Amino acid sequence: MATKLDTSSLLLALLSKCSLLTQTNLALSLLVASLASLALSLFFWSHPGGPAWGKYFLHRRRQTTVIPGPRGLPFVGSMSLMSNTLAHRCIAATAEKFRAERLMAFSLGETRVIVTCNPDVAKEILNSPVFADRPVKESAYSLMFNRAIGFAPYGVYWRTLRKIASNHLFSPKQIKRSETQRSVIANQIVKCLTKQSNTKGLCFARDLIKTASLNNMMCSVFGKEYELEEEHEEVSELRELVEEGYDLLGTLNWTDHLPWLSEFDPQRIRSRCSNLVPKVNRFVNRIISDHREQTRDSPSDFVDVLLSLDGPDKLSDPDIIAVLWEMIFRGTDTVAVLIEWILARMVLHPDIQSTVHNELDQIVGRSRAVEESDVVSLVYLTAVVKEVLRLHPPGPLLSWARLAITDTIIDGRRVPAGTTAMVNMWAIAHDPHVWENPLEFKPERFVAKEGEVEFSVLGSDLRLAPFGSGRRVCPGKNLGLTTVTFWTATLLHEFEWLTPSDEKTVDLSEKLRLSCEMANPLAAKLRPRRSFSV
C-alpha cells in the first residue's frame, strides 16, 4: 500500500517536473523566435530603402547596385512620407537629403517603392513597357476601378477600353461636338458668379466650378443636362458619391502595405467602400436602364456608345458601370482644382491678370463673349495655364503610380518585379536645374519666341508632363485642357478678380488628397469688365 503511494507520488512529481520543463522550453523557444524575428526585422530595416528593400536584398541571387533612400521605421518603413498631406514636398526634401533625386528607394510597409525627381529617369520609367501596369489598391479594387481604364491590367481588355474612350469621348471630333455644351455651362457659371457677387460681395468659386465640371461630364457621359443655378437631386447625389470616392482613393490605406492589418480594417476604408459601391451601382444602373428604354437611331452620349458595342468589344453590365463611374470620377476633379489655382494666381498677380485682359480685349473685344475658337489665339493665357500647371500640378505625384511587371534596369540600377514606381512631377517642375527661377510665377517662359516650337504639356517633354506620359498617359488630357483654358478665358474676360481686402495676399497653402488642391477655398471680389454681361 505504502509502495503504491510512494510510486504514485514519484510519478506525479516526475510529471510535474516534465510539465515545468515543457513550459520553460516553450517560453524559451518563443523568446528565441521573437528575438530572431526582431533581429531579422532590424536587419531588413537597416538596409537603404528600409525593410521591404532589405527583405529583397536578403534573397537576391546576384549583387546589384543599392538604390539610396530612407530606412524609415522597423516594420512600417516610410509610411509617414505618404501619409502627409504634402507628400510630394516631403518626398522631394527626402530625395535631396539622400542625394537621390535621380532615383530613391523607400518602403511602404512590405511594398518596395522607387521615386524619381528627374525628367530623364521619369521618361525611362513612364515610357517603359515594364511599367505598363498600376498597383491596384484595396479601395480601387473595391470601387470597381480594376475594370476601368485607370487600373485595369495592361492587356487586351485595357486596350479595348482605351480605344473605346479615345474614339467616342476624347477624339478631336467628339471634343468639337461638345463645344456648345461647354459654352452653355460657361455662361451659367458667369450668371451664378454675378449673382453671388451682387448678393454676398465675395465669391467662392470652388463649389460652383466643381458642380459645373460635374454637369459637363454628366452631359458627355450620361446625356444629362442641368441648369447650374438650380438644385438637382441627381447632381447632389452624384456629387456626394464622387466626393466619398475621392476621399477613399486619396487616403493611404495601411492595409495595402501591411497585410497583417487587413483583418482589422483600422481606417474603415473597406467598410466605407462596401457602403459606397451599392449606391454607385444603383445610380449608374438607373441611368443605363433609362437609356435601354429609349430608342435612338445613333448613339447620343457615352452610355449609348457602350450599350451599342458588339462582338469582341462588347462589355458586361458590371464593366459598363465601372467605366462610366470612372469617367465621371476622373473628369470632374482636375478641371475644378486647376481653374481655382489659376484664379488664385490672377488675384495674387494683378499685373499678369492685366496682361491677360489686354490680350482678351485685343483678340475678342468687349462686345461679345469668348468663344472656344478664340482660345488658339490667346497665346499669353495659354502660357498662364501652363505656368500654373508647373507650379501647382493637380497630380504632383502623377496621381496613380506604376508597377513593374518584370525585373528591369532603371538609371543603371536593378529594379525587381512588383516594385511600385512614382514620378514626382512637382519636384521636377520646381527643380532649379530644370527651370530658371522655378519659384517665380512667370508665364513668359511658355511664350514661344519666333522660330521656336511651342512647349507641350501633353507628355512628350518630361520637364512638365502633368497628365503623365507613355501607355498610361491620361486619355482625357486634351478635353481637360480645352475645358480649363476656355472656362478660364471666359471668367477672366467677364471679370476682374481682386483680393477681398487691402492686404493683397492669397493663401496658397496646399492639401494633397487625390489631387493637390488649395487648402482653403479662394475668396475674391469680382469687378465686371463687360457691360454686356452674359
UniProtKB/Swiss-Prot annotation:
TM spans (from-to): 26-46
GO biological process, alphabetically ordered: fruit development; seed development
Pfam families linked: p450 (PF00067)
InterPro entries xref list: Cyt_P450, Cyt_P450_CS, Cyt_P450_E_grp-I, Cyt_P450_sf, Cytochrome_P450_78A
GO MF entries: heme binding; iron ion binding; monooxygenase activity; oxidoreductase activity, acting on paired donors, with incorporation or reduction of molecular oxygen
Membrane topology of the entry: Single-pass membrane protein
Tissue: Expressed in the funiculus of developing ovules.
Subcellular location: Membrane
Top-level class of the enzyme under EC nomenclature: oxidoreductase
EC number, as in UniProt: 1.14.-.-
Cofactor(s), names only, from the UniProt record: heme
KW Repeat (keyword) present: no
Mutant lacking the gene: phenotype: Slight reduction in seed size.
Binding-site residues for heme, renumbered to this chain: C474
PANTHER family in UniProt: CYTOCHROME P450 78A7-RELATED, CYTOCHROME P450 78A9
Further comment: The gain of function mutant 28-5 (T-DNA tagging) in apetala2-1 (ap2-1) mutant background show enlarged and wide pistils and siliques.
Family: Belongs to the cytochrome P450 family.
Entry protein name: Cytochrome P450 78A9
